[in-house]
Design a protein with these regions (language model features):
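N-terminal non-globular leader segments, chiefly Sec-dependent signal peptides
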Residues: 1-98, 116-131
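Amphipathic alpha-helical packing elements
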Residues: 101-115
Length: 131
């Protein structure tokens, strides 16, 4: 990953948050109680990126059933569908909800946020530059 991303967008200038502090097994069980049908992906060293959008863009995103937010995680701990190996990084599609302080949902995956993380605003261009 480029150093500029590490220093800026993915650096440590956001609002500090704390995800679940349960064991991996326990946090997956807790998430499964709320979400029975979507695959779970547990991550560490995560950042919720709030997309900077206009009011019209926000209205369109919300009308489509989403929120203008994305998740980036430096480290995948466990992915039920094995799309990602432990230790891989991941950037989500647009989020639908962020609940309980550790559950970030998209239309196709429930991301379980473990340990410390952060939340910060970012441009759509910056978010999609993460690849």
């Amino acid at each position: 990953m480029e150093r500029g991303l590490e220093d800026g967008l993915l650096g440590e200038s956001g609002v500090a948050l704390v995800g679940s502090e349960l064991s991996l097994e326990d946090v997956l069980l807790a998430a499964r109680e709320h979400y029975k049908h979507l695959p779970l992906c547990a991550v560490q060293e995560w950042i919720i990126l709030d997309a900077i959008v206009t009011d019209d863009e926000r209205a369109n995103v919300i009308a489509a059933g989403c929120q203008p937010m994305f998740l980036f995680a430096h480290k995948v701990l466990h992915d039920e569908q094995r799309r990602f190996e432990p230790g891989d990084w991941v950037r989500s599609s647009m989020g639908t909800t962020f609940k309980e302080g550790f559950i970030f949902a998209t239309r196709n995956t429930i991301y379980v946020l473990v340990g410390p993380g952060q939340r910060k605003p970012a441009s759509i261009e910056a978010i999609f530059s993460i690849c």
